Amino acid sequence: RCIANSYPVPSVQTVASSYPQRHSAPSMERFEVVPLEHRALVAYLQERCIPAHIAKEKCKEAHYSVNGKPYFAVAFENVSGGWELRNRYFKGCRGRKDISYLPWARDGPSTECAVFEGFIDYLSALTLGIISGADAIILNSVVNVNKAVPYLKGYTAINCYLDNDTAGRTALTELTAIYGSTMIDSSTLYSEFNDLNVFLVTQSFTKNTLSNENK
């Protein structure tokens, strides 16, 4: 269940611009990617208020070993063939670190693009239904801002859903310096929260609270 349904307040911490340590690619052995089906991983994303059908459509499931011990995680591919890995206890990357680019349609690029810092925020936007028709770029780390620049050329509107912390604001400033008024700060939607997923979880909590009060 979404954590908004399970706890009196959303159990999400607001973290400043610090990034979790990641396993290096050489430490991962017997790496395999399969369709997302593991109940623990689907449940993890559902706790972040991401519906199972969206999670299974956009994500994969990775199995690997570290020092002989088996692990599994939600996997999200980047443009270099690397994989962002995430589960309830771990955040890491397999292969080259890079951005992810997801066109909305197969028959050509959209006129709009949405930019996210991490793939959980991208899944949150799909859940909220706020990027219909727009292509998407996931930075997978704000250090990848420059890698996103070539992909952003030609769009008439670029909606940025970056984190409301120092790193996120810096990334927005860098992109705005290049694309000017084409760049739209969409973080105003969740200005009281650190990121879009925290906003989604809180919105779900509020709706559930009001629903219970009206019963």
What are these regions (language model features)?
Residues 1-44:
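Non-catalytic accessory segments of DNA primases and related replication-initiation nucleases
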Residues 42, 122, 176:
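Short glycine-/small-residue-rich flexible loop motifs, especially phosphate/cofactor-binding loops
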